[in-house]
Amino acid sequence: MLRVTLSRQLSTDWNDSVKVGFIGLGNVGAKLAGSLLRNGIDLVVRDLDPATTQQFRNSGAKVAQSPREIAETSEVIITCLPSPSVSASVMEDPDGVLTGLSEGKIWIEMSTTAQQEVFRLGKKVEALGASFADCPVSGGCHRATTGNIAIFAGCAREVFEQILPLLVMMGRHVLHTGDAGSASILKVVTNYLATANLVSISEALVTTKAAGLDLATAYEAIRISSGNSFVHETESQVILNGSRDINFTMDLVVKDISLFQEVAEREEVPLELSPLLIKIFRDAEQRYGPREWSPNVIRRLEDATGLDIRANGFPAQIIDQEPEALGQEVVAARD
């Protein structure tokens, strides 16, 4: 169920008046920050890679020398970082965000992180008179490029209304998931499901090849059937091409599904599949390296069978074909 967002005029007002700081210009962060810049936001960025920050400087953004400077000069501070430990460091170091934060500002955490870390850091933010929201994204790096990715927002409704004009610049579908921390749980839930799908697709494609069937035909059979999925329509294509490039690495998968497992263990849910997925990806990470593209988990079966799971006619990278547009709030249907 979709609801039209706040007016475009409100978004225009943000363009003219609000300074936004963005920390973390990695695979996803750079794309989200780029969407803000394209929409005319007064943006200041911070990243450890000087080449990346220079690209943003060339496109009109300002570059800060520390997270503290970002917090001091921005009204909204966005972080998009690779792990909970990095997020903690960026927030709590002597030159971190917390040292520059003040009353009335908003911290938006767009990293995939643990709910407990969101709560812990959020309390420190609130103690300074500022507000916070956890807003992880889902849908693949290719959709982040065009501003068509999905965004989950866990925060007070009042805070959500304040930041919605920014969120719809970065994402096509924006869902207010409830209180702070709720979005972080749903993010790792969706990543767990995507991981399970990737492993099952890998097994399906290798088994299909072993049975002597054409892989391009198998791709179409799955696509038009009950076995289809978002992961199949995207990641299967780069698997069959051989590039395996979806801008997402083994170590990030291990982090995300481990966070999901932590949630289940905390709530005393006796999962069976999740521990197996962690074992599979840790093995793949050890074999092929933590920075290997995650679809290369299929190499475990390619190595075991001697089969080459490639086919002609598939792209090396997934490109989002949907035109960029201002996003919308998604509203959960309730009686």
What residues fall within each predicted segment?
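NAD(P)-dependent dehydrogenase/reductase Rossmann-like domain
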Residues: Q286-D335
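Hydrophobic residues within alpha-helices
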Residues: L32-A33, L121, L166, T207
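Rossmann-fold dinucleotide-binding core
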Residues: W14, V20, L25, T112-Y192
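Helical "substrate-binding/catalytic lid" subdomain
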Residues: S182-T305
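Rossmann-like NAD(P)(H) cofactor-binding subdomain of soluble oxidoreductases
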Residues: E69-E72, V76-I77, L81-I149
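Hydrophobic beta-strand scaffold residues
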Residues: L43, V63, F132-A133, V174, ...
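NAD(P)+-binding Rossmann beta1-loop-alpha1 motif at the extreme N-terminus of oxidoreductases
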Residues: L2, L6-C80, K105, M110
